[in-house]
Amino acid sequence: MPTISDDIDETTARERSLARLTVGFIPLVDCAPLVVAKEKGFAAAEDLSLELVRETSWANIRDRVMVGHFDAAHMLGPMPIASTLGIGHAETPMIAPFSFGLGGNAITFSASVYAEMEAAGARPAMGPAEMGQALAKVVSSRRDGGDPALTLAVVHPFSGHNYELRYWLAVAQIDPDQEVRIVVLPPSSMVAALRDRQIDGFCVGEPWNSLAVEAGAGVIAVTKSSLWRQGPEKVLGFRADFAQRWPERLSALLRALYKAAEWAGRKENHPELGRILAAPDYLAAPAEIIGRALSGNLVRGSGGAPELVPDFLVFHDHAANFPWQSHSLWFYSQMVRWGQAPYSPALAEKARQVYRPDLYRGALARTGIDLPRASAKVEGALKVATPVASRNGAMILGPDGFFDGRLFDPDQLEAYLKSFGVQIADGAK
């Protein structure tokens, strides 16, 4: 007759037989699919044992993937592109075969700066264009009065945060390189820096915006989803040679994360997900605060009422986990726009190939799930939820608009860059 000891021995033997993967993450709500894959057994069901290692900065994440400390990592969407192109660090080919979701960031200002914006006409219900106009008046007033320029923090130079902040400022006719000061801080340092007046605002993922509000230090002015509805954010990053050495492990991890993201995206699971993420090993933050991001019911300022933000953070719906190559090329376009990278068709192609929909499709081919037919799309073209071509004919994408109405056609990259005044040399290769 089996005993409890026999059951324990069998479980231990099973754990020893699992392929072990070490994966780094930053404590943000959008790391949820990784945590769920481990805690809810989706990884074990794919014969994987996940060791999740919490890091404090994105630079550490990148470096530890580069040198092989991590097999993979929760990574900023532009980061594997920059590493592959050798921009800002040693050239290390990387791939991104999975997206952790869409949205999840916000731009928060100190209470005192937001008061200046209110005096310039800002109101909580305003869209990003009008909010930007109020900020432009504050920037102009400070300049005319001889006051220091605003200091705004982002999490890394090669981040969606940096690019969406710059995009918003530029639409408001604020020069991000001349009229404000943009600095880099780890996400976990943002709230203290804002409270201590070392910075005037930041763009970061949750729960840090809501924690700033809860501390009375900040006011959420703009969300990523209002700047680019269903815009890309974090990816699963690997060194390119991992896929060559361990293709089955990579595919197994993609399947586990797909199922975990599907679970995390269900509203009925959000209370449990909030409790899981709140644990000291993960976000070490109150479950109630985490729940704001999960539900999209954000409190913008201290004492304010919750406000539902559509598509604030999307874990699974709308092909949120698919690594669209148009996302990769948009990130590259911003590197070029802001002087981080030169433009050439060869570099654009290299950037495009960092995102790997072929590996995503291959991992999920036998599951029967619906998959997009295309690997890239015109970003910003869908004004409403729209059926698109897919394997099972049941996929809905969008809306995915940019707040200024622009479109990004990945096949017209040069024209897109020129529309921002970027000079491209004739015959760039």
Regions found by a protein language model. Give the residues of each.
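Solvent-exposed alpha-helix faces
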Residues: 70, 199, 258-262
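Ligand-binding pocket segment of bilobal, Venus flytrap-like solute-binding proteins
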Residues: 71, 180, 184-220, 239, ...
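Extended ligand-binding regions for polar small-molecule ligands
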Residues: 41-44, 111-129, 233-287
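Short, glycine-/small- and polar/acidic-enriched structural segments
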Residues: 2-10, 14-177, 200-213, 217-230
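Internal, well-ordered alpha-helical segments in soluble enzyme and binding-protein domains
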Residues: 161-164, 186, 190, 204, ...
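Conserved C-terminal helix/tail region of periplasmic/extracytoplasmic solute-binding proteins
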Residues: 329-429
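Secondary-structure end/capping motifs
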Residues: 248-361
